[in-house]
Structure formats: C-alpha cells, structure tokens
C-alpha cells in the first residue's frame, strides 16, 4: 500500500467519523464530552456486556495498588455523568469511547480494540415506551443515511441502504424462523430488508432462550410494551454485501429504572450487585432516566467504505495467520 493510498484511506475514515458524529449530535441534541478509558475496579461502573468477558485489570501505584480496569463500554458511566452534568430532559452526551475487550474473537468484523460513539440521552418517565425507542432509532438511522449520501458525494461509493428502517421483535423473528439459530435469523431478516432493528434482546423467548445475552443492569429487556412483547432495547443490523452477511452497527436501548433493575438482577441471580456504587445510586432514584447506546465507529466505516476487514479502518493487533491471509487477498491492514 503506497503512502498516497494510506493517506487516502485515513482521509476517508475521517470523513465518515466527522460526518456521522456531527450529525448524531444534531439529531439527538447531544454534547460531545470527554470520557475515561479506565475506571476503578469494584464500583460496578464498567460494563459486563454479556456477563462473562474479562476486563483488562491492573494495580495502580498511587491508589495503593488498588486496581483499575479498562472499560468494556461506558453505559453505566454515562448515566452517572448525566447526573453530574444536571442535563435537562432531552439533552444528552456523546463520547468518543476507546475500549479493550481481550475475550473478543478475531474475525473480519471483530477486534479487541473497540471504538464507539457512546451516547446517552436524559428522558422523562413518559418516554419509557416502545414508540419513543423507535423514534430515536429512526433518527440514528437517518443520520446513517445522510452519512452514506455524503460518502457518495465525496468518494463516489453508491448508496445501498433502504430509505426506510424495518422493526421486528426477537420473538416475532423466532416465530418466523423457528428452525434457525439467532445469528441465522439475523442474516435472513437483514438480507430481506436491508436494514432492521431487532427489539427485545436479553430476555428469554418462547423457546426458553434469549435472542442474545445482555447484562442485567443497563438495558431494559423485561418491561412489557404496547405491542405485547417485552423489552425496550435492541440491535441495529444492516445487510453487508461485502461479506454477504448481516452486520450489527449498534446496540442500544431505554435503560433500566429501579424496578426493572431489581427484576433483571433477580432473573440474572446477581442481587449481590445492589451494593455497588452504580446500582445503589439507581435504586435510590439518584440517577436520571435515560436512553443510550453504542455505535461502532470502525464497523460503520468499514460498511460505508465497503471494506472486507475491520483492520482496514482501525489499527489493532491480529494473529499472524490473519495478517498473512489479508496480504494474500490484497487487504491492507492499518
């Protein structure tokens, strides 16, 4: 890869990131803020994701060797920050999150280095509805469409996203394709519609299994909705023609209130977490109601720029066999 090609690739990545982040702030009324890469261990602020990933942890000399942990994401930290900033309802924050997930599998769409636009929006109690969730998701999707159009104007890459985003609950998806695995269901529905938001991720479905696992203490995946299903969260998927597969771009949702937190901790067998800082603040009604999520920067870049490997849009470490295979296929890892 020539110097000129490298610089052009970096310029294209910067175009996507600048356009998308600016549009997201305008669409959701968000203030860009700084955020930590490291938090104190034992506070409950770092995210468990699906409950089993190990965080990067290390002793800190000036904290008497108490340990710090590199964040998985900032879902809980953002909620505390909303309270500290005393933002009004329908104001929020956007962070440029950098995280490490050492238990992540290596693949063309996975890296141990995670870069996300992590956002959180203060809401009213009356906003804790499926219709409000869908309204926010549509605004995010419109920003994705606008960014795709900008990429077309600047780089000539033809738009492929449908103008309208489809919604489906994970239980409806199970009923449509009862013999398929969750991932196979995602690929099938994304191929059919081009872009889809799957609602209700984390709670058990009629087959006794969740569509995918979710930590019990940030997204609300148990509250009944006006459509007769449970869950106020979901995943945004698009059909990626480069891999001929579905690609998840975002996981997001209305966050638990104290009732949903208590219920979900009970279901998860994790009531011991109630004594942690974040959980005790929430159970004492000291944190704002909110909606939030993460949008994968590298994934959005690789999708809009039609890249085959996430390493073409971010610098990370890879197994030697991955580097060799990339070289054989003419894939230029940064």
Task: Please describe what each predicted stretch is.
Residues 1-110, 118-122:
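Class II aminoacyl-tRNA synthetase-like tRNA-binding/catalytic domains
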Residues 11-15, 19, 128-135, 139, ...:
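Generic recognition of stable, solvent-exposed alpha-helical segments in well-folded globular domains
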Residues 98-100, 172-334:
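A translation/RNA-centric and nucleic-acid-associated enzymatic feature enriched
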């Amino acid at each position: 890869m020539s110097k000129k090609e490298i610089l052009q690739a970096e310029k294209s990545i910067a175009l996507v990131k600048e356009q998308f982040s600016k549009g997201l702030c305008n669409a959701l009324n968000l203030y860009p803020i700084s955020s930590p890469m490291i938090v104190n261990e034992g506070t409950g602020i770092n995210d468990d994701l699906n409950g089993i990933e190990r965080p990067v942890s290390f002793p800190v000399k000036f904290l008497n060797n108490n340990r710090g942990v590199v964040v998985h994401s900032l879902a809980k930290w953002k909620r505390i920050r909303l309270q500290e900033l005393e933002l009004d309802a329908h104001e929020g924050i956007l962070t440029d999150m950098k995280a490490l997930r050492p238990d992540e599998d290596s693949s063309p769409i996975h890296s141990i280095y995670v870069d996300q636009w992590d956002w959180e929006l203060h809401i009213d109690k009356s906003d804790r509805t499926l219709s409000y969730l869908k309204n926010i998701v549509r605004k995010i999707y419109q920003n994705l469409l606008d960014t795709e159009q900008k990429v077309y104007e600047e780089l000539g890459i033809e738009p492929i996203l449908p103008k309208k985003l489809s919604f489906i609950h994970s239980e409806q998806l199970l009923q449509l394709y009862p013999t398929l695995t969750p991932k196979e269901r995602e690929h099938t529905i994304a191929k059919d519609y081009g872009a889809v938001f799957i609602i209700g991720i984390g709670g058990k479905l009629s087959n006794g299994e969740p569509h995918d696992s979710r930590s019990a203490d940030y997204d609300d995946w148990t509250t009944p909705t006006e459509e007769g299903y449970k869950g106020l969260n979901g995943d945004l998927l698009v059909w990626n023609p480069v891999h001929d597969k579905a690609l998840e771009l975002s996981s997001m949702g209305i966050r638990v209130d104290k009732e949903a937190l208590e219920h979900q901790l009970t279901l998860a067998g994790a009531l011991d977490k109630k004594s942690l800082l974040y959980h005790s603040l929430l159970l004492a009604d000291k944190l704002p109601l909110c909606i939030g999520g993460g949008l994968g920067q590298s994934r959005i870049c690789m999708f809009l720029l039609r890249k085959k490997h996430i390493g073409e849009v971010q610098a990370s470490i890879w197994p030697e066999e991955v580097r060799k295979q990339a070289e054989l296929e003419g894939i230029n890892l940064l």
